[in-house]
């Protein structure tokens, strides 16, 4: 091994020694990558989950907005009625998997020792709803022979002032308001948004501990991360933390660039999450739904090519291909092929995320979604021809919606086959 490389990587290994994992050093999008060490010994399972096994996944995302009360009625009964409706409507459209938000804002849809109760449940973050929503949602989903994946935003705490008020026990307030100044940068601000800072081993451990809570205590079929990694490619966002890393190095060490350092931080989080899940229950799947453009993903420190080719990161990838065949920047067919080519590990499933919310609307992609009423149908057919393992639709609220009714009707002709 090259001596310069050793000098470069050893300090980073020391920096993140709290969490063992796979570290990928990648200065450019397509440069050769070096791995140390990867979870090659982790047992991989061939079955999918609750009822799908090796069949086609037909999933729908259930975002926090779909779970939230529309009339400020925060009773246990009203929540259960909303979720019952979600399950019943999904069954009508041949959905066999629900991807349900359980941690949208550094919060929790169950009683957690780490994260406060979600504001979705009572209107106020931190308030106990008096029942276990996650337990109910899983039991209801399984009773209809559907799979349940717990959807987690790993870093997001607040987005555009949602939720409006963070609980005192929210990690942001806890770390910013205590007497310990050394943890102030464990959370970061960007405009009206707040995020956990994944460069610190302590922060990554807390995120992973939150996943452990779910997998240990609930019979989920999967854990699902979406595309929220580093929220910006602006290097000022975490410059002070990067400077801390630089100051920790010996004079002879060759530092990682800030881009390389960010990628290593995220890879440590992802591989650590995967390892933790498998150590508890090897049948629970771990998947990520990155944005469509791989180059943009890499700018946000998502090391797609490593995740898609090596053991120890994910069980599935579901790129959010919310684009149609006429998209002038990246067409659907081109994106499908790019991802098909990227996912070279036969142990990793390839699902395609479809932007159902765009169907029948003239608001997106220069109005090209109004050019036909069978775009989703053709996307399913093209995806199947490419060898994908299933589809995830965004989002549930557009399954039974006047805007998308014709598209859904045509898509069902092929999804039911």
Question: Whereabouts are the PLM-identified features?
Answer:
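Active-site-adjacent "subsite" loops/lids of carbohydrate-active enzymes
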Residues: 50-81, 150, 155-217
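The substrate-binding groove and active-site-proximal loops of carbohydrate-active enzymes
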Residues: 65-77, 115-131, 190-205, 254-265, ...
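Aromatic-lined substrate-binding rim segments of carbohydrate-active enzymes
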Residues: 86-87, 103-153, 254-280
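Polysaccharide-binding and catalytic clefts of secreted carbohydrate-active enzymes
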Residues: 177-310, 322-323
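Short, acidic/polar
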Residues: 72-91, 203-214, 296-312, 332, ...
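Sec-dependent signal peptide cleavage junction
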Residues: 19-38
């Amino acid at each position: 091994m090259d001596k310069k490389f050793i000098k470069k990587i050893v300090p980073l290994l020391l920096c993140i020694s709290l969490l063992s994992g796979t570290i990928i050093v990648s200065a450019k999008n397509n440069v050769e990558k070096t791995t140390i060490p990867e979870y090659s010994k982790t047992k991989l399972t061939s079955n999918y989950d609750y009822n799908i096994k090796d069949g086609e996944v037909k999933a729908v995302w259930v975002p926090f907005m779909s779970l939230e009360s529309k009339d400020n009625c925060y009773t246990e009964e009203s929540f259960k009625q909303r979720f019952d409706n979600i399950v019943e409507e999904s069954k009508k459209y041949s959905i066999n998997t629900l991807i349900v938000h359980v941690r949208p804002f550094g919060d929790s849809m169950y009683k957690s020792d780490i994260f406060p109760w979600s504001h979705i449940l009572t209107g106020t973050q931190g308030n106990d709803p008096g029942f276990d929503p996650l337990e109910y949602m899983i039991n209801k989903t399984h009773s209809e022979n559907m799979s349940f994946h717990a959807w987690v935003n790993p870093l997001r705490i607040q987005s555009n002032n949602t939720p409006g008020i963070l609980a005192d026990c929210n990690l942001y307030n806890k770390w910013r308001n205590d007497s310990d100044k050394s943890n102030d940068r464990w959370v970061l601000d960007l405009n009206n948004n707040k995020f956990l800072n994944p460069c610190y081993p302590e922060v990554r451990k807390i995120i992973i501990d939150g996943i452990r809570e779910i997998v240990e205590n609930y019979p989920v079929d999967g854990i699902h991360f979406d595309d929220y990694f580093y929220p910006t490619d602006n290097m000022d966002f975490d410059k002070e933390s990067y400077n801390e890393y630089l100051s920790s190095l010996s004079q002879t060490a060759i530092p990682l660039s800030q881009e390389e350092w960010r990628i290593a931080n995220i890879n440590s989080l992802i591989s650590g999450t995967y390892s933790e899940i498998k150590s508890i229950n090897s049948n629970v799947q771990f998947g990520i739904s990155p944005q469509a453009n791989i180059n943009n993903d890499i700018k946000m420190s998502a090391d797609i090519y490593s995740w898609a080719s090596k053991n120890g990161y994910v069980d599935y990838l579901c790129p959010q291909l919310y684009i149609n065949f006429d998209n002038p920047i990246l067409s659907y067919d081109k994106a499908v092929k790019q991802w098909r080519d990227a996912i070279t590990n036969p142990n990793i499933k390839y699902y395609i995320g479809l932007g159902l919310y765009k169907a029948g609307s003239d608001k997106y992609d220069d109005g090209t979604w109004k050019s036909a009423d069978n775009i989703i149908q053709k996307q399913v057919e093209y995806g199947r021809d490419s060898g994908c393992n299933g589809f995830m639709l965004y989002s549930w609220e557009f399954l039974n919606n006047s805007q998308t009714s014709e598209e859904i009707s045509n898509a069902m002709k092929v999804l039911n086959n």
